[in-house]
Amino acid sequence: MLKKTLRHFSIAAGCILLMSLTQISMASTSKGTANLPSSQQPKDLQDRVRHSLLMLPYYGVFDEIKFSIQGNTVTLAGDVRRPLLKFEAEDAVRRVDGVSNVVNSIEILPLSTADDALRSRMYRAIYSQPGFERYSIQAMKPIRIIVKNGHVTLVGMVGSELDKILAGTAARNVPFAFSVTNNLSIG
C-alpha cells in the first residue's frame, strides 16, 4: 500500500513539475523576441516587417516598397501608385512588435493615363514571354514594373541571368517608354 501511494505521489509531483515548466516556457515565448539571442532579433524583426508589407491588400506589381532597419527604427522607401498605400504601409509597420519609429520616404507616383497605359503594355510584354509562366502565376509577382513619367524601372528577382536579359529586352521593345532601367536581381 505504501509503495502504491509513493508511486502515485511521484507521478503527481512529476505532472505538476511538467505543467509548471510548460507554463514558464509558454510565458517566455509569448513575449515575442525577448527570449531570442540578440543576433536573431534583427532577422526576426526584418521578417515581421517584410510580412506586414507583403500582406497589404493593394500592394501590386506596379508598386515597390523597400525598408531598412536601424535599431527599432524602420525607414520605408520606394514608389507606389495609390496614395493610401503609402500610409497603409506606415501603419502596418508601426503595428509590428519591436518597431518604435517609422520614417516614411515612400514616393507617390504621379497620376498619368499615359503611364497607366505604359504599365499595362509593359506587364503584357514581360509576363507573356515564353518561359515566364512560372513568374506570371505567382500571387506576388517577382518582377515589379515602376513607371514614372514614361521612365520604366524593373525591380525584383528572377531565377537566372537569361530571365533578367529577356525581361529587360521585352521592356525595351515596348513603344513610348523614354527609358528602361533593369534593376532585377538574380536569386
Each model region followed by its residue ranges:
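N-terminal targeting leaders
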Residues: L2-G187
